[in-house]
Amino acid sequence: MKRKWYIFILTTLFFWGCHSKQEVVEIPNEPFFVVLGVAQDAGYPQIACTKQCCTATYKNPTLKHMVSCIGLVDPISNESWMFDATPDFTKQVKLLTNYVKEKEVPDGIFLTHGHIGHYTGIMYLGREAMSAEKVPVYAMPRMREYLTNNGPWSQLVSTKNITLQPIQNDTIQVLNQRIAVTPLQVPHRDEYTETVGYMIHYGKKKALFIPDIDKWQKWERSIVEYIKEMDIVFLDATFFKNGEINRDMSEVPHPFVEESMQLFENLIPEDKKKIYFIHFNHTNPLLEEGSKAQKQVQAKGFRIAKEKSVILF
């Protein structure tokens, strides 16, 4: 029988006083992922959005979603890591701590690139908030330079709230005796920093996280071949189809989900089910439970990342 850990979480609710309730979180006994958020950089709902897709969330707050982010947990060593630091960092860190013992911050943060939904959460590690001590932040060369030479991020470095850990494209970073991470540079709008996805290794098993890329065809590598080699794949699904937003979509290039499904249509079912679409714009119908788009994706054998879900290697 497999050993399970149970952590009792004390949730405090404030309303003219204090009340509390206990929740039980079941923790696998081998490394796993926690989906900490699924929305595009601006979150869901998005600022100034008056469309039904957003107004529905004000009537029913349970429909809201945090910005795309995944957590990796090793229950054997009681360690955790985050991939990206979003504007929802505070809530996501707390969610991740449910799966480790007596730790309030992750053991490391891997940044993919310098767009607002992917690194700005580290501000909560600074003096105005937690005033953390030497939290490891893994960053590529341009990202390290950007954080070191531009305020307010440079203050996090100079006051040692964070310690920048250098990583290089295609170079493996060993985290412990079970887990390692390899950054993979991908084409994207690199105004300030380069953009990477991450391959996560656990023994002979591998996962891939690419929340942002311009188009699969612009990458000199084959995403189809990568999928065949992986056990879990989290992929950019910002927009479901062309024309989804009322602007020139070439200004914000991403692979449309319709394009990705067509590209992946010849994969065998076992490979298709490895794929979790993530990083949804507020206009993306994959955010709507039971939508035609959701049913279409699932009928083709693909998966949709769900916030707070636990995914085993």
Give residue spans per PLM region:
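Cap/insert and terminal regions of metallo-dependent hydrolase folds
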Residues: 204-206, 213-309
